[in-house]
Design a protein with these regions (language model features):
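Short internal beta-strands
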Residues: 11-16, 95-97
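Single conserved hydrophobic/aromatic residue that forms the stacking wall/gate
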Residues: 1-10
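N-terminal beta-loop-helix "entrance" segment that forms/cooperates
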Residues: 14-31, 178
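Short acidic low-complexity segments
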Residues: 32-41
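Internal gly/pro-rich beta-alpha loop/helix module
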Residues: 68-69, 82-88, 93-139, 145
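Active-site rim loops that border cofactor/substrate pockets in soluble metabolic enzymes
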Residues: 161-188
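Glycine-rich phosphate/diphosphate-binding loop of Rossmann-like nucleotide-binding domains
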Residues: 142-167
């Protein structure tokens, strides 16, 4: 309906979700998927994916007068808020996730530049074993929501062993729907 009203093509920054059926349906309705805001005409319309966006992407969209709809998953938004809250208290933050994944890029991009802490990305157990932290006694942990609990379990245990005072979120960051699907596949 919005496309008809504006007679414009809606461009989605990244695929909205990791769901082929949804993506194909949107494509059949004329949606175009782009990687960067520079691929969207000024005054264009865009949808930000469920993976979330960095502060810089949001600022650029506003600066260019793009009409945008933020489809960030509520669980991803929760992680963004945790990062901001932890950063405001000057904590160092470790994020467990995959480099270059849109969700990780968006979450890392929510870390305020004026924080007294630092943000680190840990992708695997080897990195968890070797990471050097500026504030090991003032440290917290967040995770990419689309990882499975089993993917992060060893990493979290290693980080807790190395940094006994590390704070975790009050509730799990892993998406329960993702975990349920992964558990179902494993049970086959």
């Amino acid at each position: 309906r919005l496309r008809r009203q504006r007679q414009m093509c809606i461009r989605d920054r990244h695929e909205v979700v990791h769901n082929r059926k949804v993506v194909e349906d949107l494509k059949s309705r004329g949606a175009k998927f782009v990687d960067e805001l520079s691929e969207i005409p000024d005054d264009g319309i865009t949808i930000f994916s469920a993976h979330g966006i960095s502060d810089q992407v949001e600022k650029e969209a506003k600066l260019r007068n793009l009409k945008f709809f933020d489809a960030t998953c509520p669980l991803v938004s929760k992680v963004h808020k945790e990062v901001i809250r932890f950063a405001q208290t000057g904590k160092d933050i470790i994020m467990i996730g995959h480099k270059n994944h849109p969700e990780v890029e968006g979450t890392l991009g929510r870390f305020p530049g004026d924080s007294k802490g630092n943000m680190y990305l840990v992708e695997n157990l080897l990195q968890a074993e070797n990471i050097e932290i500026n504030q090991p006694n003032n440290l917290c942990l967040v995770t990419q929501t689309t990882l499975s609990v089993s993917d992060t379990e060893e990493i979290v245990l290693k980080l807790k062993e190395r940094f006994p005072l590390i704070l975790e979120p009050k509730s799990e960051d892993i998406c329960y729907a993702t975990q349920n699907r992964q558990d179902a596949v494993l049970s086959l």
